[in-house]
Amino acid sequence: MFVDDVTRAFESGDFARPNLFQVEISYLGQNFTFQCKATALPAGIVEKIPVGFMNRKINDAGDRTFDDWTVTVMNDEAHDARQKFVDWQSIAAGQGNEITGGKPAEYKKSAVVRQYARDAKTVTKEVEIKGLWPTNVGELQLDWDSNNEIQTFEVTLALDYWE
């Protein structure tokens, strides 16, 4: 086996780079594409349905479900990035004394995740995530020993599906 055989095994001729990506959630504005530091494409799961027959089990396909989606966001001094998620979450369920909440058509949004080739211009994969809304706007860590770092926080979003 030669090194060339390894690279030939990948039809595009190159490996995907996990650091060449952008996340666009148009509801949060253009700047979010630069504030989203990390994410993963959410898992799609088809549960199995075990069916027993005469001491044997066969597995049939069940329903498709989708895991929640988590993004890591770089915070800014004005806390605008985090506040946008808090405000979005408040559309689904308010934080005050009153019980408030919008309709799904008001709080469910879409996102696009794009992965790029090494030239950082050619889109190699694009996934659209539908029915998003933030279920958990993560904590902000404060620590006197955290020098030379950018503050980040995680947001977990529920979703309906991706394509």
UniProtKB/Swiss-Prot annotation:
The keyword RNA-binding appears for this protein: no
InterPro entries, per database record: Phage_T4_Gp19
Localization per Swiss-Prot or TrEMBL: Virion
GO BP: symbiont genome ejection through host cell envelope, contractile tail mechanism
A molecular function GO annotation: structural molecule activity
Entry keyword set: Late protein, Viral contractile tail ejection system, Viral genome ejection through host cell envelope, Viral penetration into host cytoplasm, Viral tail protein, Viral tail tube protein, Virion, Virus entry into host cell
One GO term describing the cellular component: virus tail, tube
Function: Structural component of the bacteriophage tail which consists of a contractile sheath, a tube and a baseplate. The central cylindrical segment of the tail consists of a rigid tube, composed of multiple copies of the tail tube protein. During infection, contraction of the sheath drives the central tube through the host outer membrane, creating a channel for DNA ejection from the capsid into the host cell.
Family listed: Belongs to the T4-like viruses Gp19 protein family.
Protein known as: Tail tube protein gp19
